[in-house]
């Protein structure tokens, strides 16, 4: 899968760095998302766990070419959103 990242114009670095997220963590979530749903304006939202156990929300847009996407941002789930995600995952596992 070809993954491109939005780069912060001020630094030239991937925007995800502003949220202390690495490219590898984003790839972990995108390869095995716990949830993947429609976002705004054609974007998609993937929620999932990294190999080391962090739960992330990744906002991305599928590219026109197959097996390619553009990551806008990603950040760690905390508080109520994290609790709700874990609850949904437990319920999904009980089915």
Functional labels for PLM-detected ranges:
Residues 1-95:
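Ribonuclease/tRNase effector modules and their secretory precursors
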């Amino acid at each position: 899968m070809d993954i491109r990242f939005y780069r912060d114009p001020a630094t030239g670095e991937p925007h995800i760095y502003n949220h202390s997220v690495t490219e590898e963590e984003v790839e972990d979530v995108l390869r095995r998302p716990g949830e993947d749903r429609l976002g705004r304006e054609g974007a998609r939202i993937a929620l999932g766990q990294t190999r080391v156990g962090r739960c992330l929300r990744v906002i991305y847009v599928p590219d026109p070419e197959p097996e390619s996407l553009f990551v806008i941002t990603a950040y760690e789930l905390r508080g109520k959103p994290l609790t709700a995600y874990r609850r949904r995952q437990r319920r999904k596992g009980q089915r």
